[in-house]
Amino acid sequence: MTIRNQRFSLLKQPIFSILNQHLINYPTPSNLNYWAGFGPLAGICLVIQIVTGVFLAMHYTPHVDLAFNSVEHIMRDVEGGWFLRYMHANGASMFLIVVHFHMFRSLYYGSYSSPREFVRCSGVVIFLLMIVTAFIGYVPPWGQMSFWGATVITSLASAIPVVGDTIVTWLWGGFSVGNATLNRFFSLHYLLPFLLVGASILHLGALHQYGSNNPLGINSYTDKIASYPYYYVKDLVGWVAFAIFSSIFIFYAPNVLGHPDNYIPANPMPTPPHIVPEWYFLPIHAILRSIPDKAGGVAAIAPVFICLLALPFLNQSMYVRSAKFRPIYHIIYLLFLADRLLLGWIGCQPVEAPFVTIGQISPFVFFLFFAIMPIPGRVQRENPNYFSENFAFSYPKK
């Protein structure tokens, strides 16, 4: 390319050159599989949520007397409003499904290991922001479940010693959930996705500092290809499959992931018989309920995110990252995955036997995974031949 052509090339301009470097010509391992496509797919979901949210905000009124009716106005009177709302509501679930797959892929292939600790930590921050954004986004429809969900969850802050009641009053903007609560929750719900964009850019920058991990879990600095067009074409298969999967919910079962009580206007007088959070809160809800004491249940939530942040430092397997070559860790990983699904199921069950007992065992298994995480890696470091000698069935025979 001549100097003149380079000067007038769009991709050589300051801002576009950064996009070209990180999204088009970014060197990528040549052996990535389809599981690696969940990262870019999460970015697409974030863009969809922001775009649909902005258009919905144009027709929404954050007032306790008008909020529920404004949502119905969007559904009935705004052209294409039903599509925007269902895409936004179900898109939140799709977004979190994609992120869960992305996180469990990272756990399996060891993408959190050194030198990518900051990639993992920034990802956990993004996940925490997503959880907060999803929770406060459940309040604006101002149905029964929105009102009582906000009341129950925010009142958990009262378990904090000394300042708990003050924090609850500050969150509510008064002595109960009301108009001030709805206004501040709607404002935060509009703001936080843009913070998510900033955190995602940091996450992407941290990833590109050392390059992407690969299914073998080894560093490869030579066997790489450009992201475009190879992985764009490959990821296109996953994007189309995801679009079809999402369309099934949007067009044929838009309310299956919601709660019917949220189609009843918020009323502080009658309490719903069974207050159930959205599916993505169910594991946290199960851990919260596993401890009878309110303060103890709230205190058990913080270690969940602390363990996720500490994961890169708990892993003692420095050179062999992928679970494909770590048989013991592979078994532990599958048990952890099963326990995570069990927590989600327990979180939506009533507080009665045998669900109470199962709900107390499942969080113990969840935290046990992080407690024993260093052991397989330490054994492997002290005796590299241990696994090949004792678990030869895990490796293909020559």
UniProtKB/Swiss-Prot annotation:
InterPro entries: Cyt_b/b6_C, Cyt_b/b6_C_sf, Cyt_b/b6_N, Cytb/b6-like_sf, Cytochrome_b, Cytochrome_b_C_euk/bac, Cytochrome_b_N_euk/bac, Di-haem_cyt_TM. Heme b b566 binds at residues 102, 203. It comes from the Eukaryota. Its cofactor is heme b. It is found in: Mitochondrion inner membrane. A ubiquinone binds at residue 208. Belongs to the cytochrome b family. The main subunits of complex b-c1 are: cytochrome b, cytochrome c1 and the Rieske protein. This is Cytochrome b. It comes from Daucus carota.
